[in-house]
């Protein structure tokens, strides 16, 4: 469906969460939605992967090893990586993981390609993955109460998606880039209830969703998404108190000042052509609490 028409139709729905869901369904297309529901009823393939992560990245090569190894150690089976015109050796850095069969790599050029990558991931991996997390290279999923992320997900079999809150980490005063791991370098984070931590990322059951709505929420086929405490979600994430006591996403949005300036130069895989403003650094450089060792 035409994007403008979809926005007009969705705009008349008063409840924000319902409106967002229908925005996603209309973007996916009503005929596609009907076709998908029929296909899901017929397809009983046993998923190959318990948990996969889908990410699109542009010139994030130096960060991949730590990010992949962290998530492998915490229960991720597979990574679907979409490379948005990287020229920093990303493909070569990922090669050992591609050879192991841990990374499924796609070169994904173009402008504003994040949602297109997520759509492609769902269409190609809907039946081979039990859960898919949609995340970025500056985000680390951290199970707090469980040993692994799948251990956490075992309590959510009845839900089509789980929304997990951020915990934003600042620069800690670091001006220059370093080869040390991100999670070791940046130990200072925001206050847990800071408004930025209301943002979420979703882990979805791909057989029960149509498509992503932006990078945070998903258009569900049925049922309600859950928060990390296992409660059905009835309010938009911007209206909810952040939860980080069971599981959280460490969000290293700025890293050091030098790395942020590199981020300004490369732009975002989500598609904006304008440079990331310095105001973003000032907003996300939150260093209120030092993480316990």
Walk through the language-model features, giving the residues of each.
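Catalytic-site signature of metal-activated, phosphate-bearing donor transferases
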Residues: 2-35, 116, 143-293
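Cell-envelope/extracellular polymer assembly enzymes that use nucleotide-activated donors
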Residues: 50-52
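Active-site beta-to-alpha loop of glycosyltransferases that engages the nucleotide-sugar donor
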Residues: 55-69, 85
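Short, acidic, metal-binding catalytic loop of nucleotide-sugar glycosyltransferases
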Residues: 69-78
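A conserved acidic beta->alpha catalytic loop
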Residues: 83-96, 110
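Conserved donor nucleotide-binding strand/loop of the catalytic core
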Residues: 95-113, 192, 196-201
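Active-site nucleotide-sugar/metal-binding loop of Leloir-type enzymes
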Residues: 119-131
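Short beta-strand-to-loop acidic/aromatic patch adjacent to the donor-nucleotide binding site
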Residues: 129-142
């Amino acid at each position: 469906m035409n994007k403008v028409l979809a926005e007009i139709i969705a705009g008349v729905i008063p409840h924000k969460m319902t409106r967002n869901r229908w925005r996603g369904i209309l973007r996916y297309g009503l005929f596609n939605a009907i076709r998908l529901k029929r296909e899901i009823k017929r397809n009983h393939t046993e998923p190959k992967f318990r948990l996969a992560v889908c990410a699109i990245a542009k010139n994030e090569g130096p960060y991949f090893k730590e990010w992949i190894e962290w998530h492998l150690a915490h229960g991720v089976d597979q990574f679907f990586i979409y490379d948005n015109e990287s020229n920093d050796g990303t493909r070569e850095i990922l090669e050992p993981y591609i050879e192991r069969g841990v990374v499924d790599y796609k070169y994904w050029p173009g402008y504003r390609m994040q949602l297109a990558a997520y759509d492609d991931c769902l269409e190609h991996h809907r039946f081979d993955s039990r859960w898919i997390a949609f995340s970025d290279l500056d985000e680390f999923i951290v199970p707090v109460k469980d040993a692994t992320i799948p251990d956490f997900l075992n309590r959510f079999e009845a839900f089509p998606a789980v929304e997990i809150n951020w915990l934003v980490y600042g620069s800690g005063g670091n001006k220059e880039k370093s080869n040390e791991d991100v999670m070791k370098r940046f130990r200072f984070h925001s206050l847990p209830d800071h408004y930025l931590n209301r943002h979420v990322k979703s882990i979805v059951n791909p057989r029960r969703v149509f498509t992503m709505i932006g990078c945070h929420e998903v258009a569900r086929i049925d049922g309600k998404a859950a928060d990390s405490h296992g409660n059905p979600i009835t309010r938009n994430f911007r209206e909810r108190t952040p939860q980080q006591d069971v599981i959280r996403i460490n969000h290293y949005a700025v890293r050091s000042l030098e790395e942020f300036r590199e981020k300004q130069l490369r732009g975002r895989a989500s598609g904006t052509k304008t440079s990331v403003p310095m105001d973003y650094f000032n907003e996300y450089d939150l260093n209120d609490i030092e993480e316990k060792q």
